[in-house]
Amino acid sequence: MDLYAVWGNPIVQSKSPLIQNKLATQTHQTIEYIAKLGDLDAFEQQLLAFFEEGAKGCNITSPFKERAYQLADEYSQRAKLAEACNTLKKLDDGKLYADNTDGIGLVTDLERLNWLRPNQRVLILGAGGATKGVLLPLLQAQQNIVLANRTFLKAKELAERFQPYGNIQAASMDSIPLQTYDVVINATSAGLSGGTAPVDAEILKLGSAFYDMQYTKGTDTPFIALCKSLGLTNISDGFGMLVAQAAHSFHLWRGVMPNFVAVYEQLK
């Protein structure tokens, strides 16, 4: 039986084994998919041993996406630009191929919500690792992006890296252009840490739809709670993105594209 896993630290909270096994059942693929706790000091040795023992592929979650990318021999364009991967596949020649399905997972979920049309204005809050993985697929979907970050320089550097691929501009959190936004995407992990919003409420009120790349089971994320408290509508957490990126990883490994919406509906 072909072996796959998700690697992270911590990992006990991961929904990936549940999701991937549902995708396998739906597509009549026989696989074993497990969760593996990565050692912060010995992750590289663990991962290489995992593949040497015959594993076919894996997902990578926090905090190992950049380190896993460094171990790969070949890369997709979206992994290369993100300098991080969430998916590794062992090729027939034994080489490791890195992909990043986070962004295409986000785009696929925005399509499910009917929130994705060409030439929209999208505001992304946060310029960290989560954002790096999603910018290329959003730009390829012809979205016009304002990338806002507390540290302007970080947003500026990221925007400049992706400018050859579409329309993207940087802003600091307190200088976001006052214009309407078709979608506001929260890519900050902090949410409302310390009770402070990632962005001024008046900016949020310029949005039409609100997407949090985070999700918490059974309760609202801080960003979603903030949106609701402002009376905003068209709000979604990132669980659909999680299922969709898993489906795209599965497709890379198995050559079969699952119906991610059916699995999302089962698990939500």
UniProtKB/Swiss-Prot annotation:
EC numbers, comma separated: 1.1.1.25
Swiss-Prot/TrEMBL catalytic activity: shikimate + NADP(+) = 3-dehydroshikimate + NADPH + H(+)
GO terms classed as biological process: amino acid biosynthetic process; aromatic amino acid family biosynthetic process; chorismate biosynthetic process; shikimate metabolic process
Domain of life: Bacteria
Keyword Ribosomal protein: no
UniProt keyword terms in alphabetical order: Amino-acid biosynthesis, Aromatic amino acid biosynthesis, NADP, Oxidoreductase
Family: Belongs to the shikimate dehydrogenase family.
Metabolic or biological pathway, per its Swiss-Prot or TrEMBL entry: Metabolic intermediate biosynthesis; chorismate biosynthesis; chorismate from D-erythrose 4-phosphate and phosphoenolpyruvate: step 4/7
Assembly behavior: Homodimer.
Function in brief: Involved in the biosynthesis of the chorismate, which leads to the biosynthesis of aromatic amino acids. Catalyzes the reversible NADPH linked reduction of 3-dehydroshikimate (DHSA) to yield shikimate (SA).
Protein name per UniProt: Shikimate dehydrogenase (NADP(+))
GO terms, molecular function: NADP binding; shikimate 3-dehydrogenase (NADP+) activity
Gene Ontology CC, one term: cytosol
Active site positions: K65
